[in-house]
């Protein structure tokens, strides 16, 4: 028997079991749908290397002495001219002409493109959160896949600066759902005992994108080729939409009980569970719908003290974390480039195994605190090394190690955050978290690129942020072994669970699975 409106019972788990083929299928589909986030090179475009297999078109000039990507010289190098047209080698075999190249524009254009891309993600994450909470997770995912395919294809052959910047913004706006929607879907189909592991699996593309995004984009000869390859991959994702289910949990709380029954029936067949032909989720009386009529406005979030504190704490946590991560990433990339990122990847694997081993005895919040302490200790060590002017090789290890720890922190907060929010505001608030995170990254980029603070001061700020994040961890509740909060009152983790079954005035006999 399962009851809508309580924090400790789940219809999906009751019918399908704690784990099965269907849960694994949804997890791997969700992880695959998040792969395009690894291919959005515009998020950190100012870190990309100049493209290859692009040649300046000098056919209209005579006596050309030397050429580069952006200029050519004539008359034994005495006169230098800027290139106005280029020949691009597309897919390593087809040449076509372009009249504008962003890498030959002012360097600030690369940073402005990054800011425009991030700004689109700020708005897009919130908008898709509202769409997912209002119309379903699958609709948001479907819009993202189609938009990703269309905008990637147009960007491949875009030859205008104004259109290019507009398309970057629109692509970020309309293709930002799958950054986090797969995590929400996995959360809502997983049982409490398997949710942490399945969330970790589906978060792998986001973890890899933190390290591999820029190197992966630099492997391609030019952005046109990279965009088209990403476009082909996005087209293949259309097939997965056929197997992507709507969240049964979301359907139950949005008066979609018949659709939830069909989804669970199909899932039961995949799991090899036989259900009777008249399987129904039957409300015994209309009081069971009281929880469905709850007011989900932002005012409700702000009027409950503990819910307000929890929400604001999580939003601030994401801003500070993304600022910290962006600062570490830029330093490692600028000082050590590929070798630094290779070290980071190795440290990330090592720390991942260590955290996985410790997770059997420690809670996620404790692991989060430990990794933040590692970042703080590493940043503090760098401060002393810089102040004392030690020139030792260990400095080339500390920064990648701190960056690897920050990526593990990212995986942990991806595991924790969606499990804090009620069903009908989960996607919106999770999207707001990502939006706040991108704002933190943009602030960091502006500070670092324009060098508004000294390098040592920036490292001190990193250490301070790590300590502040540890303090914020104390406010976050434990999510291990808990069911997801169904309604907003369930988000008040700080109150005692005296009336679990009657928290929404719903008794155990009001909604049953038969």
Language model: regions and residue ranges:
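Glycine-rich segments within core transmembrane alpha-helices of 12-TM secondary carriers
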Residues: 33, 37, 120-121, 175-180, ...
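Conserved MFS/SLC helix-loop-helix module at the cytosolic interface between two early adjacent transmembrane helices
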Residues: 123-154
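Central cavity-lining transmembrane alpha-helices of secondary-active solute carriers
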Residues: 112-130, 182, 342-357
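Hydrophobic alpha-helical transmembrane and interfacial-helix anchor sites in secondary transporters
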Residues: 51, 131, 216, 358, ...
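C-terminal transmembrane bundle
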Residues: 38, 172, 330-333, 337-501
